[in-house]
Amino acid sequence: MIFRWLTFFSVLPAMAATVSGTVELTDAKVKGWDGLVVWLEPLQGRAALTPGRVVLDQKNKKFSPHVLAVPVGSTVDFPNHDPIFHNAFSNFAGQPFDTGLYAPGTSQKVVFRREGFVRVFCNIHANMSAVIVVVPTPYYAVTLANGGWQMANVPPGEYRLRLFHERATQETLGGLEMKVVVSDGMLTVPRVKVSESGYLEVPHKTKHGREYPAKPQENGPYIGGK
C-alpha cells in the first residue's frame, strides 16, 4: 500500500507558479510605467500556445489599448466605433498588414502568425498609433501604471525573461534579458530598470510612404487609399 501511494504521487505534475515583478522607467518622456510587455520563453523547447482573439478598439481617434500583447496565431479585431472612416496598417517587420479603409460601425481582423513588434497606425489620422507585441509563449504580461506585472500558472523550469518598451532601443532591451528559474509557489523577479536614453522618435508616414495631409478626409474615400 505504501509503495502504491508513493507511486501515485510521483506522477502528479509539478504545481505551477505565479511570477511577478516591477519595471521602472528611467529618462522617461511620458509619465507612468504602464504599457511595457514582459514575457518568459522556456530555455528548453517551446511552450504550447493557445491563440486567442482580442480587440484593439478605434474610438475618439485613438487605438485602445495603446499596447497589446498576444501569443503567436492570435486574431486581433479592429472595430471602428467612431462616426468617421478609419484604417489600420503596419509597415514594420513584425507583420506588415493593411485593413483598407472601412466605415463607421464595421470591423476588420488580422491574424498574427509570427512573433515580433507591430507598430500600428491609421492611414488617415497621423496621431493614431498602437503597438501589438506578438510573443512565442503563453507566459506574458503588460505592466500597470506603477510598473507592476504578474503572470499566473507558469510551470516550473528555466526561462529567459524578455521585455519590450516602445521608447527603448533594441540594444537596451537586449541587455536586460535574464535567466529566471521558476519552481512552485510565488516568485518575485528583481526590479528591472529600462532607460529611454538613445531612443530617437521619428514621425511616421502613411502606408504609401507619404506625408500625412494637413486635413484628413474622414467621411469618404481618400486619394491613394483602398
Model-derived segments and their meaning:
Residues 17-226:
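Extracytoplasmic copper-binding redox domains, predominantly the cupredoxin/blue-copper superfamily
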